[in-house]
Amino acid sequence: MLAHLTGVRGSVMLLAHGNMRVSHVSTHVALEDVPKRLTPERLRMVIDLTNDALLRLGIARPKIAIAALNPHAGEGGLFGRQDIDVSAPTIAKAVADGLDVVGPVPGDTIFVKLRAGQYDAAVAMYHDQGHIPVKLLGFQVDPATGRWQELSGVNITLGLPIIRTSVDHGTAFDIAGKGIANEHSLIEAIDYAERLSAGVSASKS
């Protein structure tokens, strides 16, 4: 909706918590539709917007890893050819254009390496592939009561002519006004907005 209202061709969702920064090729679509959303044009847009965001955050030479769509990056075509026919050539073109991009990296190892600091960001192919690792680290629940104890993480929309960040959780209207809301995600969202704004100002000076 924000892309439509601001007149841009497309936007990208980036989730962030600590050094876990994950942008997405697709988000709210059925799994059966994900392969159709993975096109060279869309993947390159996600790579470019992610790289731009990292530069604005003060990372001089961003390193971005691209997650594989299929198990074991397709296992040489045994489990699908999208990683071979779409992702690999797009990554190669980005590298030829001077970007530091690697992949496709199998989805079962890419986020371990991201958390360890081997990459500055990762590109996930679909919603749950990117959301699960970020929320696994940013969300904590009380095992006895099932209540959320910590909700950390930021949802950032890339590609807009404005800076847009938000908390990485729902509206929680059920606890509004009770004095028990967790503020961590909101503070992170404000911090990211400030840092992105500073990056924009620096690029224009």
Segments (PLM) and residue ranges:
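Anion-binding alpha/beta catalytic cores of soluble intermediary-metabolism enzymes, centered on
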Residues: 1-82, 89-205
